Regions:
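Short S/T/G/P-rich N-terminal loop/turn motif that feeds into the first structured element of a domain
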Residues: 1-48, 54-68, 75-106
Length: 106
């Protein structure tokens, strides 16, 4: 598995809320090939985006979708950077899938 983590600093809390809303609505179709997508608010103006793919090639193919998202939220953003690499470890508790914030897709 291959993981890409984006960290985004927004111009305001409202900008972050708008960008996260756009991501929730579009990420599954934009990040083609993603096996797992997660966002985390790291402050009132920043968020971390995690995307897990089967391979580095799948992650690279999804860069088109990442660019679409960056283009859409461009005026909302102060700074963006990302890290990526092979997944070393993952654990998923069976109760996790029942959490209210989880959206199951196909």
């Amino acid at each position: 598995m291959y993981v890409r983590v984006n960290v985004v600093d927004f111009k305001s809390k409202e900008a972050m809320d708008e960008a996260l809303s756009i991501y929730r609505l579009n990420s599954a179709k934009w990040m083609v090939g993603a096996q797992f997508l997660l966002t985390m608010k790291t402050s009132d103006q920043s968020a971390m985006y995690v995307a897990v793919y089967n391979s580095e090639d799948d992650a690279d193919n999804a860069l088109v979708g990442r660019e679409k998202y960056i283009e859409v939220m461009g005026d909302l953003v102060h700074d963006v950077f990302y890290h990526e690499g092979d997944m070393d470890f993952a654990y998923l508790n069976e109760n996790f899938i029942n959490a209210d914030s989880i959206q199951i897709g196909s």
